[in-house]
UniProtKB/Swiss-Prot annotation:
It comes from Danio rerio (Zebrafish). It is found in: Cell membrane; Cell projection. The chain crosses the membrane at residues 1636-1656. PROSITE patterns: TSP1. Residues 257-321 are annotated as: Disordered. Residues 1-36 form the signal peptide. This is Thrombospondin type-1 domain-containing protein 7A. Disruption phenotype: Morpholino knockdown of the protein impairs normal embryonic development of intersegmental vessels (ISV). Morpholino knockdown of the protein causes malformation of the glomerular tufts and a reduction in the number of podocytes per glomerular tuft, and causes pericardial edema in many cases, probably due to impaired function of the glomerular filtration barrier. Morpholino knockdown of the protein causes loss of the parachordal chain in the developing vasculature and absence of laterally projecting motor axons at the level of the horizontal myoseptum. Its main location: membrane. Gene3D superfamilies: Thrombospondin type-1 (TSP1) repeat (2.20.100.10).
């Protein structure tokens, strides 16, 4: 393909033919090779094959083992053959030596991982994968590494199998990413500079900087500088070719005099040195006298003579004055003790001056004589490095004990400065260092350990769990169940091992609380759930029936008074014992009492008298002796009772009337008998057969068929003993207070430390008549009188226990830095046990506070500067050769002493000021000794004050001094102005809000409880609060100032509302429903309805019903007694004979009776109820048809009950019932069968029974409980095999197993509301100044919500803005241009100032310069650097030099990313230096431009894209732009660069035609192209647009206007710029052509035709009219009701 693409014309064709021939040849050779292989493979081959190596075997670990493998001969097709078929010489070995690995080798061998190699593109490994033409995100690659098993100790390689035994071999390859090459990105060029020369040939340049370095093999950075020549004009005269160049200042040297003195003293002995010093001193004094004499003679002015006379007078002062002056000087020297740290020696330094040609070569100095030579010397301070002393010994370790937690102390050592650096000497090293330490030596005690302690838990409170609408809030007495209790946690010093038991809660043993910060562990919980046992109410059974009249005491029957008693039992174990139960016995006085009586068990069969077969007879009673409680006793006890007599009866003869047995006595009509009421009982019997005429016993009349007797004849006066509550337990002094005595005194009581003594309790017992009140005690049975006194246990007294007072809190500081607020210190003690049972009360005072002692002012430090010394000049011997120099005047250097002072003016060590007083003042400064011709002026005065703001001016002045007043040159006010004027400041301020509104904050101390109750969960803050917005104040120059300038306190306040939480509101519980079953186990239900959903963080609703989301159910099982409602049948009515034999009164007949459903009671059925309450299947018959026996017929009793079917039910089993003959038949007749049988059929008359267990009920709590421990129940149900529930007795009679637990405890989760701590104090402002400062306060979750408790608020922190304060800071000005004083080029200085700036701290505000006084409180640092540098050396290039610019600022940090996704190669930033030159001929001598990069953090992602400008003719601008809007060079892919030039061939010369970007002629906007047949533009025609007139148009004609959006050209057809019509409707003049009108007319005619035909086809033919018939029905009009079916 490459060959074909490079060969043009015929070359391409011949190459294609050769390629075809080559492929044919390959195909031929391939077929030949296949044929050859086929021939060769016809002969079978045999090869050796091997299996895997087996396990290494050996007697010892390590080398020397052996392993084997299987070797066999196989055919090439895979089947095994004999060994002889394979070449024996090629047989592989089946055994080899190996290394036997043991477990302990794991410590000796390990994998050694090599470094990853360079990332290699996948395309290089896979030759078939082409590399992408355009790199987008990078190229996938693979990198490898070497991995081998080595011996750990010496790194010797070992077999990989050893390491693989323990761990698989790590991977050898991994995927990697080769990032796309990143070209260097540079900024736009700066504007061209001015010409480097004012005349002649010069240079202009423009610069750019590097924004992103080349990465990953990207193209290098282009030139950062562009030059072009310039020539402003011809130079007049000869152009200067030479320039003076100054070199750098040399090393500071001592003056020759000092040097000679120092050198001489070093060689001369001490005595000679002393003599020499005396001689020099005499010479100096003589020299001074000569100089003073000369000066005296030279003095001309009167003022100098006056000063000289003053000095002479001073010399003549008295001795006392001289002594005072001497002491003052001594004191000053002592105050200037800092002088010993600075050995300031003023020396001099020189520099070299050369003359250079503009070509860069050095010339003779004479070539630069036309220029003034600069000064080559200056005074300086001889450089000395910092000198420090040796380190002091380490201080004692700050920790004096052994810390069990391993924490260490600190120890420090220091060194002193002996010589501070001067003259640019080396700075001082660190003067203090510290290190962690532990105390050394023996007998070091362990450190004090602090532990958390807690008070006892408070009483359990249930009220805090009540919801808002709980009705129990109004009456909280008796609440029980789950609750919450709290305690206080405090920190104490843990007791030492030698101390006694301090854990007990004794007053003297309680530990002193300390600061909580000393305890390191997690503090104990301060809240926990608790449980108050709910009182178990006493449950009693129903009253039993009234017993017989019995003696009060059967042992004493002397009195004739007796009582009838009824009793009830206690059904449970009530709280507090049975003493709180209601009375269990009621008594009624009666007459003729007896303790024992005969009970008639039954009457025997009727035996006729005189051994007859029928007729009158007697029934003997069967009796048993019973006591008053109905219990069977010995018959001898009833010897005094009246034995029941035999009862008269009659055995009916065949002709006698037959009566049924008497029914049972009915219930007594009244429970007692009185004046107006008497109890009656009835019983009845019926006629079963009539007598036979005259021969038999006649049937009685109807009145004889019923009997009535009196019952409950006792009076209606019921008495019982009523007990009052037990009184207070009073100590019984007769019983000793020992535990054993307690156990004896109160039987059944376990020994408990909580009880200390035995007491007695009494209660009131009275006799009460029901419904009347108290009566005399004799009315009640004395034997049943409850006890009035009982022993009791007295609980031990428990005193209040408090901790000792804590130590006084330390005063906030030992000194006051300002402010008059008195500091306070406090101490507290904590109640750890509340008093109980009459113990000692707690003290009232638990917190004490007192003022701190008056503290002194904090000992601050400050630098004190002393007077400047005289100005020292460079020695005259050095200066005398310099032109214009004078011996006594010129520039010099002066020094001063600096000392350290306390703020109270006392002296202090210099080290204190170095540490606390900020930077040290300057020690030296340049000075000028004025020469005679110099002008001398005073310093500027302060500006005068302004009378008012914004009015007038203010001035400052200075004056000439000395002879300068007389010199004319000094009177030139332009050179030496004596006054300056400026306008008075005009301060105008305006305030405006800034920032967001704060959170809504309640006023301090405002906590609203819900519903007026301050209980748990109700301490939510809600109600009206305020939110704040900061105010900012600006002056007239829009500079930030203090808010007080705007008369503002810094905030805008606005009222706001914090909504109070509202809990879920449910209705009260409904009444329990009736049990779902009338027999057996069912369920009963009660419910609550949702009244209001929670909002604003209130308690959530409990789980609602899944069907109806607005209801809460509670379901419990219930048991209905199957015998509580019974059918009661009245006696059968008289027979109604249907076929009456008037003679015999017998035959077929009907009997009826009433059957009623009645409620069953202890005494029997009582009140009738609705029939549906009784089981309809068990309802007795209300009518029966039968045959009334005729005389002499056999009369049988009614059928008895059916016998039970044997279980299990079986069709082979039967049941039967029987009847007995009451009247024997005559001899001619027989009795029918007296038994009846039927087959036992399952679920018909035979049933199986089984227990069924109900589901557990919901957890049931006491009505006084909210949550906590409750109980759940379930019940047994006896179920018949036909699924009908029956009485439990059916299952119990069968002895079925009951293996289920009917009751179980359960827990209802307590709805614990979230508990939050109080708000903390407001924090410090997050910013010390600026607009963004915030104050925060926080609270924490003390108790998370549980169950349906109120959830925690999401607002755990609040903020409000800080008052806005201006941000003041010191900033540098820009460096001044480099200036080499006195020369055109060379070494010079540049300067900058440090000024005070104000900003808003946002970083977006550049800041404004303000008075330096506003930064007076700030340490003079710039960007954290305390070393202020206001001048530095620099180089001014000479005209013949080419040099590098200063480094640019570091570029913004930039990430390597694509489309905003970080590629993971880090961030980088770059800076660069460009090349500058001033002479064109020196460009070849320029150095290389430089750039350097460094990694950075928090880089930004930038995208680059091409931007284009509008076409101007055939060209347009194309540039690359970064995503932040910066125009750059590089960064955009060159393959996607848009074209910047376009041209069409042939040229587009048609009107309104343009050359498109595709190089094809097109039309301007609003015009369409008309093309020739060969695709060339013929003309540009206006596109017609139909304009529809609107109501506001005055003209309604159709206009043809230019289109606003003409059809854009498409690239569908080559050679055409866009789509055009084949038939053009417009002519060359823009009007419609004639054929267009014809087409329109034809279309209109066709439309009219289609409409007409459609009308005719759809029109229905007209029907003939008929006469309407009068009897025709009118249609029914139906009203539409909205139903869709209508």
């Amino acid at each position: 393909m490459g060959l074909a693409s490079r060969a043009p014309g015929k070359g391409g064709t011949s190459a294609g033919a050769l390629a075809s021939l080559f492929r044919v040849a390959l195909l031929f050779f391939g077929l030949w090779d296949v044929q050859t292989q086929t021939v060769a493979n016809t002969r079978p081959t045999y090869i050796w094959q091997t299996g895997p190596w087996g396990r290494c075997m050996g007697s010892e670990c390590g080398p020397g083992g052996s392993q084997s493998r299987a070797v066999w001969c196989a055919h090439s097709e895979g089947w095994t053959t004999l060994h002889t078929n394979c070449q024996q010489s090629e047989r592989p070995s089946n055994q080899q030596s190996c290394f036997r690995v043991c477990d302990w080798h794991k410590e000796l061998y390990d994998w050694q991982l090599g470094a990853w190699n360079q990332c290699v593109p996948v395309s290089m490994r896979n030759a078939g994968v082409p590399r992408p033409a355009v790199c987008t995100r990078g190229e996938e690659g693979i990198q490898t590494r070497e991995v081998g098993c080595v011996h750990k100790s010496d790194g010797v390689p070992a077999e990989d199998a050893i390491c693989e035994y323990f761990e698989p071999k790590p991977r050898l390859e991994q995927a990697c990413l080769i990032p796309c090459p990143r070209d260097c990105v540079v900024s736009e060029f700066s504007p061209w500079t001015s010409c480097s020369k004012s005349c002649g040939m010069g240079l202009q340049n423009r610069l750019r900087s590097v924004l992103a370095p080349p990465l990953f093999g990207g193209s290098a950075c282009p030139n950062l500088t562009e030059f072009r020549t310039c020539q402003p004009g011809k130079c007049e005269g000869v152009e200067s070719l030479h320039s003076l160049r100054v070199g750098p200042w040399g090393q500071c040297m001592a003056s020759p005099i000092r040097q000679a003195r120092d050198t001489g003293e070093a060689r001369v002995p001490k005595a000679e040195r002393k003599a020499k010093r005396d001689r020099q001193a005499r010479q100096e004094r003589q020299g001074k006298r000569r100089k003073n004499k000369e000066k005296k003679e030279l003095r001309e002015s009167k003022g100098e003579r006056v000063r000289e006379r003053v000095k002479e007078k001073k010399r003549m002062r008295d001795p006392e004055t001289r002594e005072l002056i001497k002491k003052k000087r001594t004191r000053n020297r002592q105050n200037r003790q800092g002088l010993k740290f600075w050995d300031l020696q003023v020396g001099y330094q020189t520099r070299e001056v050369t003359c250079v040609h503009r070509s860069g070569s050095t010339a003779s100095i004479s070539q630069c004589t036309q220029q003034t030579l600069p000064v080559t010397y200056q005074a300086c301070v001889i450089s000395k490095d910092c000198e420090v002393s040796e380190w002091s010994d380490w201080s004692v370790c700050s920790k004096e004990c052994y810390d069990l937690n391993g924490r260490k102390g600190q120890r420090t050592r220091t060194r002193q400065v002996q010589q501070f650096p001067v003259g640019g000497g080396a700075e001082c090293p660190e003067l203090e260092e510290s290190e962690p330490c532990s105390p050394q030596g023996e007998g070091i005690p362990p450190c004090v350990v602090y532990n958390w302690r807690s008070t006892e838990w408070s009483d359990c409170r249930v009220d805090v769990l009540l919801s808002q609408q709980d009705r129990r809030r109004s009456n909280q007495t008796g609440l029980c169940g789950g609750g919450v209790q709290t305690r206080e946690v405090y920190c104490v010093q843990a007791p030492s091992e030698t101390s006694s038991n301090l854990g007990s809660l004794k007053s003297k043993d309680a530990l002193r609380p300390v600061n909580s910060d000393l305890c390191l562990g997690v503090p104990h919980n301060t809240t926990q759930l608790c449980h108050i046992p709910c009182p178990v109410e006493c449950e009693v059974s129903a009253w039993s029936a009234w017993g017989p009249c019995t003696f009060e005491n059967c042992q004493d029957q002397s009195t004739k008074k007796g009582f009838k008693l009824r009793k009830r039992k206690i059904m449970n174990e009530p709280t507090g014992g049975t003493g709180n139960c209601p009375h269990l016995t009621e008594a009624i006085p009666c007459e003729e009492p007896s303790c024992y009586d005969w009970l008639l068990v039954k009457l025997e069969e009727c035996v006729p008298d005189n051994d007859k077969v029928c007729g009158p007879g007697t029934q003997n009673p069967q009796v048993q002796c019973i006591n008053s409680d109905g219990e069977f006793v010995d018959r001898q006890l009833c010897r005094d009772a009246i034995l029941p007599m035999p009862v008269l009866c009659e055995v009916s003869c065949p002709k006698d009337c037959v009566l049924s047995p008497w029914t049972s006595w009915s219930l007594c009509s009244n429970t007692c008998s009185g004046k107006n009421s008497e109890g009656k009982q009835t019983r009845a019997r019926s006629i079963l057969a009539y007598n036979a005429g005259d021969g038999g016993v006649q049937c009685p009349n109807s009145s004889a068929l019923q009997e009535v007797r009196s019952c409950n004849d006792h009076p209606c006066t019921v008495y019982h003993w009523q007990t009052g509550p037990w009184g207070q337990c009073i100590e019984d002094t007769s019983v000793p207070s020992a535990n054993s005595s307690i156990s004896r005194a109160v039987p059944g009581t376990a020994v408990n430390d909580a009880f200390c003594s035995v007491g007695m309790q009494t209660r009131k017992v009275i006799c009460v008549r029901v419904n009347v009140g108290q009566v005399p005690p004799k009315k009640c049975p004395e034997s049943l009188r409850p006890e009035t006194v009982r022993p009791c246990l007295l609980p031990c007294k428990r005193d209040c226990v408090v901790t000792p007072y804590s130590d006084w809190t330390p005063c906030p500081s030992i000194c006051q830095t300002g402010g008059s607020v008195k500091k306070k210190q406090s101490r507290k003690r904590i109640i750890i046990q509340l008093p109980a049972n009459g113990g000692q009360d707690c003290p009232e005072v638990l917190f004490q506070e007192k003022d701190c002692d008056a503290s002194s002012v904090c000992p601050g430090y400050r630098w004190k500067t002393h007077k400047w010394r005289r100005c020292q000049l460079v020695p005259w011997s050095i200066r005398q050769d310099s032109p214009g120099a004078q011996e006594t005047c010129g520039p010099g250097l002066q020094a001063r002493a600096v000392s350290c002072k306390k703020l109270d003016s006392g002296p202090a060590d210099v080290a204190a000021c170095l540490k606390f007083a900020g930077p040290m003042p300057q020690l030296t400064q340049s000075c000028q000794l004025p020469c005679q011709d110099d002008c001398q002026l005073t310093a500027w005065s302060k500006f005068s004050t302004c009378a008012a703001d914004c009015v007038g001016v203010r001035t400052r002045k200075r004056t000439l001094v000395g002879k300068s007043k007389k010199r004319e040159q000094c009177k030139n006010t332009q050179m030496y102005p004596l006054s300056e004027t400026q306008y008075c400041p005009c301060n105008k301020y305006n305030a405006q809000p800034v920032g967001n509104w704060s959170d809504c904050i309640l006023p301090e101390g405002r906590v609203e409880g819900l519903l007026g109750m301050k209980v748990q969960g109700d301490i939510k803050e809600c109600g009206q609060g305020y939110r704040y917005q900061a105010m900012v104040c600006y002056d007239q120059d829009n500079r930030l100032v203090e808010t007080s300038r705007c008369n503002s306190h810094g905030y805008i306040e606005e009222a706001c509302i914090i909504p109070c939480p509202s809990d879920c509101k449910l209705s009260e519980w409904s009444n329990w429903s009736r049990c779902s079953k009338s027999c057996g186990s069912g369920v009963k239900v009660r419910s609550k309805w949702l009244r209001e959903k929670p909002y604003n963080g209130g308690r959530p609703c409990p789980k609602l019903d899944h069907v109806n989301q607005a209801q809460v159910y509670e379901v419990v099982p219930c048991l209905s007694d199957c015998s509580q409602y019974v059918w009661v049948a009245e006696p059968w009515s008289v027979w109604k004979v249907s076929n009456v034999d008037l003679k015999e009164n017998c035959g077929e007949g009907v009997q009826t009776r009433k059957v009623r459903c009645m409620q069953n009671t202890v005494d029997g059925p009582s009140d009738p109820v609705e029939d549906y309450l009784c089981d309809p299947e068990e309802m007795p018959l209300g009518a029966r048809e039968s045959k009334l026996p005729c005389p002499e017929d056999c009369v049988l009793t009614d059928w008895g009950s059916w016998s039970r079917c044997p279980l299990p039910c079986n069709v082979n089993s039967t049941r039967q019932r029987s009847a007995s003959p009451i009247r024997q038949p005559s001899e001619r007749k027989q009795c029918p069968s007296t038994t009846e049988k039927e087959i036992c059929t399952l679920n018909s008359n035979c049933f199986h029974y089984s227990y069924n267990i109900t589901d557990w009920s919901t957890c049931q709590l006491s009505e006084r409980a909210v949550c906590g421990v409750g109980f759940k129940t379930r019940m047994l149900d006896c179920v018949r095999s036909d699924s009908k529930s029956v009485d439990l007795k059916f299952c119990e009679e069968l002895g079925l197993e009951k293996k289920w637990q009917m009751n179980a405890s359960c827990v209802v989760e307590c709805p614990v509301n979230c508990q939050l701590s109080d708000w903390s104090s407001w924090s410090e402002c997050s910013h010390t100044c600026g607009l963004a400062g915030k104050l925060w306060r926080r609270r924490t979750v003390i108790q998370a919500s549980q169950g349906d408790g109120r959830p925690c608020s999401s607002q755990l922190e609040q903020w409000k803005p800080c008052p806005v304060k201006p941000c003041f800071s010191w900033r540098y000005s820009v460096w001044s241009p480099c200036k080499s004083e006195g020369a055109r080029c060379g070494e010079g200085l540049r300067f900058r100032n440090v000024s005070c700036f104000v900003s808003d701290g946002s970083g977006k505000d550049a800041g404004s310069m303000v008075d330096e006084e506003l930064c007076g409180d700030l340490e003079q640092t710039v960007d954290g650097d305390k070393q202020i540098i206001l001048q530095e050396s620099c180089t001014v290039p000479c005209p013949g030099e080419c040099y590098l610019t200063d480094w640019t600022m570091w570029s913004p940090c930039q990430l390597s990313c694509i489309g905003g996704d970080d590629l993971g190669f880090g961030s980088v930033q770059v800076r660069s230096r460009a090349v500058l030159a001033q002479e064109p001929e020196n460009l070849l001598q320029c150095p290389e431009q430089e750039w350097e990069a460094r990694p950075c953090t928090e880089g930004q992602c930038y995208d680059y894209k091409w931007m284009t400008g509008a076409w101007r003719g055939s060209s347009r601008q194309v540039w690359c732009q970064r995503s932040d809007g910066l125009n750059v060079t590089g960064g955009c892919q060159s393959t996607t660069e848009p074209v910047s030039d376009r041209s069409c061939d042939p040229a587009c010369d048609k009107p309104r035609s343009i050359c498109t970007e595709a190089g094809i002629c097109g039309c301007e906007e609003g015009y369409t192209e008309v093309m020739t047949s060969d695709g060339v533009l013929d003309q540009c025609t206006v596109i017609p647009v139909l304009e529809i007139p609107t109501a506001g148009d005055s003209k309604a004609d159709v206009k043809t206007i230019r289109a606003l959006n003409p059809t854009e050209p498409t690239a569908n057809m080559p050679g055409r710029a866009g789509r055009t019509w084949f038939l053009q409707p417009f002519g060359p003049d823009g009007k419609l052509k004639t054929w267009v009108y014809g087409v329109a007319a034809g279309a209109f005619v066709l439309l009219v035709f289609i409409v007409s035909m459609t009308y005719l086809a759809c029109k229905k033919p007209k029907k003939p009219q008929r006469r309407q018939m009068n009897n025709r029905l009118k249609p029914l009009t139906l009203a539409y009701d909205g139903d869709a079916d209508m």
